[in-house]
Regions:
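Catalytic core of soluble alpha/beta enzymes
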Residues: 1-121, 125, 144-155
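Flexible C-terminal active-site loop/helix
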Residues: 113-176
Length: 176
């Protein structure tokens, strides 16, 4: 089993490296956003010294022009970035981040931002076109109690789209 953890920016820059060293005992794949976003120099130092990979998540939110994206990636140089298309300019904005990261040897994966199954379906189908090699974070649709049924289902550790299942009548569902 490969585990990723998310600190959601909870560590202080002062004690983050010590916490990362302690967490490294668990042979984690990576940690997301160990310190609060906006601390580029401190995050860069962590990415350089961390005993295991760091993935940026919240750090990317609100950075929507190519020059700033390049500046962030070259300043911090994380091992991974995590893309939520709904928060990064849609599919086009996410593809730009992926391209810029790949040019710099930085990996990536896609997650959802708690979209309904309609949005999750679109993100999942786009993500499949990327031919990902890492597990993606798209299994969130089952968290909702009032979500439109869609031909998506989890089987094992994969999210599947079943083309034999008829897609729902969205307008009818909205009227309910």
């Amino acid at each position: 089993i490969e585990l990723r953890v998310d600190a959601n920016g909870a560590f202080s820059p002062k004690d983050a490296l010590e916490k990362l060293k302690r967490l490294s005992e668990y042979q984690l794949h990576s940690i997301e956003q160990p310190i609060r976003a906006g601390q580029w120099e401190e995050m860069a130092k962590l990415c350089e010294c961390s005993p295991f990979p760091i993935a940026l998540d919240e750090e990317l939110i609100g950075i929507n022009n190519r020059e700033e994206e390049i500046k962030l990636l070259e300043t911090i140089h994380p091992q991974y970035i995590i893309l939520k298309p709904s928060l990064h300019g849609g599919i086009g904005g996410s593809e730009e981040w992926i391209e810029l990261a790949a040019e710099r040897g930085i990996g990536s994966w896609v997650t959802s931002a708690l979209e309904s199954n309609i949005g999750l379906n679109a993100i999942a189908q786009w993500t499949a076109t990327l031919i990902p090699t890492l597990p993606q974070g798209l299994g969130t649709g089952m968290l909702f109690t009032d979500n439109i049924d869609y031909p998506l289902h989890i089987e094992g550790d994969c999210l599947w789209y079943d083309p034999n299942v008829q897609e729902p009548d969205i307008l009818n569902w909205i009227k309910q």
